[in-house]
């Protein structure tokens, strides 16, 4: 699967938000300029895409599915993005960054309900057990990440002894620690 290979810090400065989680990403100045309504919508969309590492084609499908649903579109959008396997691996603390978590999944270090899954965009269902492969538990980085990083969200359950975690329930848009105006993202795509 393709992913963004350009300059990450430059993108973070352009967006005005540290979407990659690296402490030095915003060390240089961020240019302040007044944006039009369209510009604000585009910027919010780009922030959300950059944070989750999703390319435009896949992101567009996720947003259109959220817009079609009868439930609250913001919550459906967040649930679709948060249920991705690479994101759940990051939220559980297996990887220190979303990019590291994505690499762990694609290299086959992660099991879902005891089966190896190497697709980062795999949708995890409620109650599915996400665990680290027994061979991968010997890798010091993964073991230390999992034991030291505490999940900041309430919709996942973490078991440090068995190196696993579960998605307990679907998240609401207000619970997710991503500073994005979801309504602007949905407005951007509802015009097209």
Swiss-Prot record:
Q: NCBIfam families this protein is in?
A: PRK05327.1, rpsD_bact
Q: What is this protein called?
A: Small ribosomal subunit protein uS4B
Is the keyword Ribosomal protein in the record? yes
Instruction: Please verify whether the record's keywords include Lyase.
Output: no
What does this protein's UniProt record list under function?
A: One of the primary rRNA binding proteins, it binds directly to 16S rRNA where it nucleates assembly of the body of the 30S subunit. With S5 and S12 plays an important role in translational accuracy.
| Residue span, S4 RNA-binding domain | 83-145
Tell me what organism the protein belongs to.
Answer: Clostridium acetobutylicum (strain ATCC 824 / DSM 792 / JCM 1419 / IAM 19013 / LMG 5710 / NBRC 13948 / NRRL B-527 / VKM B-1787 / 2291 / W)
Instruction: Write down the HAMAP family for this protein, in alphabetical order.
Output: Ribosomal_uS4_B (MF_01306_B)
- Subunit structure, per the record? Part of the 30S ribosomal subunit. Contacts protein S5. The interaction surface between S4 and S5 is involved in control of translational fidelity.
Q: What is the lineage of its organism?
A: Bacteria, Bacillati, Bacillota, Clostridia, Eubacteriales
GO MF terms listed in the record are: rRNA binding; structural constituent of ribosome
A GO term from the CC aspect: small ribosomal subunit
Name the gene for this chain: rpsD2
What are the boundaries of the signal sequence?
none
Keywords from UniProt, A to Z, are: Ribonucleoprotein, Ribosomal protein, RNA-binding, rRNA-binding
Biological process (GO), any one:
translation
Q: Which family does it belong to?
A: Belongs to the universal ribosomal protein uS4 family.
User: Which Gene3D superfamilies does UniProt cross-reference here?
Assistant: Ribosomal Protein S4 Delta 41, Chain A, domain 1, RNA-binding S4 domain
